[in-house]
């Protein structure tokens, strides 16, 4: 997938000679896993090899595998009697040891040419694309409860694309150089940050964990990677692939840990240079506050980047294509059980179209299969991730039953006897300000507000002001004037904004992802500028003509 085109010349730029190189990569194709296909046979074999087994996963500091006494287990969401992985939490002393070892390794890694670092990630991408694809997918399916297609788009193409495109952007960044002047040359050196980066990963995307740790490392940084407890198996597989691809020891430390212990330890280190985070708003705020409280101890101001979820909307105009609305909303709201940061959870429908859309949603709803994604590939989505998530969503379903403003029109049941299963649920609200339209649920729950069709301008204002989040949103008008009007009204309501398409499904290099407001710092991983976030540029001016006169001409 990598093709480098070298330009005809090389130019001397201060301390370095820069080759003008353009790197061509393409998005990794999504495989279909049809009956009888090679990829399906390989995946089924990988799933059989993991069935009923418990993987042992240590903390890894440098080349040392370390076990502590604080033992934990990752459970399969759809069969919580299956312990997918046995792992341990790093304690404060071990985390500090990891920091010390990382900082000691930083200088040599940072001085390595970016092209050499990039080749490690190109190789890792090729390994995931080829021989390790089935293994990483199988571990994502069993450990995180994903269906075949959801595991595929996450743990294969998205992760592969992160590695390849970020490597491409890192190499091409070297060509972004300042102007020279007569008698001198100017060079921009893209250094890593001075210190270490703490990467805090979520459960819902194997690719995000790999990117949170991988991109800072690619740019010359050393990283402490705290994987999610509920994505441990797939995360460890990605870590091992990076090491197999040539990543030196101590560049990424693999350190499962209790969240508060990890946060307290990294934010109290003078060497903290950055935090790369995906998770909840309360956790991100806690980390940010700890950084603020400790500013006086740091050698540098830490870079803090975070993505925190959303309360994503679908706005339907009276000119909408009904079938597109129904299909897009079902997929956005219920794929992976609504556990995507971009999932649609609030919908605004004009009264003139609601009967059609309602019936369309219910017709599809009856066909949705929720179950074991390993035993039945026709499953549309599986269980939610763990008992905490199940309890939280169950609480929202109970709220929907008791609220006078809410009516459950489909689903509403849940069962955690074998797995953490929640039915896809559609709720109608008569109050657009009801808290279910404001707060993130992170489950298969869609709430619909039906509005008078001529009040769509008021509804656009309502969408923009109802929720503190601003991650993704979609509008469904065929009327071009409404598309333009909505774009202005919702300019700040979503970092990823879709027109006549669902609010999920961003692709690396096509729709760089992220939002503002309570949704995060909107650094747009998957885009060309993301790598710059993890550099500390140095400008070097080298003068070739001796300076012989201290007086300025006007002084003559």
Swiss-Prot record:
Belongs to the aldehyde dehydrogenase family. Keywords: Mitochondrion, NAD, Oxidoreductase, Proline metabolism, Transit peptide. Its EC number is 1.2.1.88. The active site is at residues 307, 341. It catalyses: L-glutamate 5-semialdehyde + NAD(+) + H2O = L-glutamate + NADH + 2 H(+). Its main location: mitochondrion. The gene is aldh4a1. NAD(+) binds at residues 226, 279-283, 440. Transmembrane segments: none annotated. GO terms for biological process: proline catabolic process to glutamate. PANTHER family: 1-PYRROLINE-5-CARBOXYLATE DEHYDROGENASE FAMILY MEMBER (PTHR14516), DELTA-1-PYRROLINE-5-CARBOXYLATE DEHYDROGENASE, MITOCHONDRIAL (PTHR14516:SF3). It is found in: Mitochondrion matrix. InterPro entries: Ald_DH/histidinol_DH (IPR016161), Ald_DH_C (IPR016163), Ald_DH_CS_CYS (IPR016160), Ald_DH_CS_GLU (IPR029510), Ald_DH_N (IPR016162), Aldehyde_DH_dom (IPR015590), P5CDH/ALDH4A1 (IPR005931). Irreversible conversion of delta-1-pyrroline-5-carboxylate (P5C), derived either from proline or ornithine, to glutamate. This is a necessary step in the pathway interconnecting the urea and tricarboxylic acid cycles. Residues 1-17 form a transit peptide. Pathway: Amino-acid degradation; L-proline degradation into L-glutamate; L-glutamate from L-proline: step 2/2. The record marks 204 as: Transition state stabilizer. GO terms for cellular component: mitochondrial matrix. This is Delta-1-pyrroline-5-carboxylate dehydrogenase, mitochondrial. Substrate binds at residue 506. It holds the Pfam family Aldedh. CDD domains: ALDH_F4-17_P5CDH. It comes from Danio rerio. One of its GO terms (molecular function) is 1-pyrroline-5-carboxylate dehydrogenase activity.
């Amino acid at each position: 997938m990598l093709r480098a085109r070298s330009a005809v010349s090389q130019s001397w730029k201060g301390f370095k000679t820069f080759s003008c190189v353009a790197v061509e990569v393409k998005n990794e194709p999504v495989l279909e896993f049809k009956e009888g296909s090679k990829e399906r046979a390989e995946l089924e074999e990988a799933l059989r090899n993991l069935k009923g087994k418990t993987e042992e996963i240590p903390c890894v500091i440098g080349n040392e595998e370390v076990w502590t006494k604080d033992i934990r287990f990752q459970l399969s969401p759809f069969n919580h009697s299956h312990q997918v992985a046995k792992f341990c939490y790093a304690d404060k002393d071990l985390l500090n040891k990891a920091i010390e070892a990382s900082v000691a390794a930083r200088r040599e890694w940072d001085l390595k040419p970016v092209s050499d670092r990039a080749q490690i990630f190109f190789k890792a991408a090729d390994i995931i694309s080829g021989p390790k694809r089935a293994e990483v997918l199988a571990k994502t399916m069993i450990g995180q409860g994903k269906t075949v297609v959801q595991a595929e788009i996450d743990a294969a193409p998205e992760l592969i694309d992160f590695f390849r495109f970020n490597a491409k952007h890192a190499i091409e960044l070297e060509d972004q150089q300042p102007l020279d002047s007569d008698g001198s040359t100017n060079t921009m050196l893209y250094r890593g940050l001075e210190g270490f980066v703490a990467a805090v990963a979520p459960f819902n995307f194997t690719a995000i964990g790999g990117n949170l740790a991988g991109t800072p490392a690619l740019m010359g940084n050393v990283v402490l990677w705290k994987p999610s407890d509920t994505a441990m198996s797939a995360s460890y597989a990605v870590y091992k692939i990076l090491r197999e691809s040539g990543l030196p020891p101590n560049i990424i430390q693999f350190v499962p840990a209790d969240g508060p212990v990890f946060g307290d330890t990294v934010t109290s280190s003078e060497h903290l240079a950055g935090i790369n985070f995906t998770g909840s708003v309360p956790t991100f705020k806690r980390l940010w506050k700890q950084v603020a409280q400790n500013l006086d101890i740091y050698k540098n101001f830490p870079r803090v980047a975070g993505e925190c979820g959303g309360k994503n909307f679908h706005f339907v105009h009276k000119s909408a294509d009904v079938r597109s609305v129904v299909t897009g909303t079902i997929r956005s709201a219920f794929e992976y059980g609504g556990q995507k940061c971009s999932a649609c959870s609030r919908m605004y429908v004009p009264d003139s179209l609601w009967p059609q859309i309602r019936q369309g949603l219910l017709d599809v709803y009856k066909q949705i299969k929720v179950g074991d994604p390993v035993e039945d590939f026709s499953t549309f989505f599986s269980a939610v991730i763990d008992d905490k998530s199940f309890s939280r969503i169950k609480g929202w379903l109970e709220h929907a039953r008791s609220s006078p403003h809410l009516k459950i029109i489909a689903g509403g049941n849940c069962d955690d006897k074998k797995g953490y299963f929640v039915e896809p649920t559609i709720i109608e609200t008569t109050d657009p300000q009801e808290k279910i339209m404001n707060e993130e649920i992170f489950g298969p729950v869609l709430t619909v507000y039906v509005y008078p069709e001529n009040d769509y301008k008021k509804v656009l204002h309502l969408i923009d002001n109802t929720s503190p989040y601003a991650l993704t949103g979609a509008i469904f008008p065929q009327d071009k004037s409404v598309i333009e009007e909505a774009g202005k009204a919702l300019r700040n309501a979503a970092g990823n904004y879709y027109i006549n398409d669902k609010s999920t499904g961003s692709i690396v290099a096509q729709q760089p992802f992220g939002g503002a407001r309570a949704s995060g710092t909107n650094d747009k991983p998957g885009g060309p500028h993301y790598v710059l976030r993890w550099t500390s540029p140095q400008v070097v001016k080298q003068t070739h003509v001796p300076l012989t006169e201290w007086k300025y001409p006007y002084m003559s």
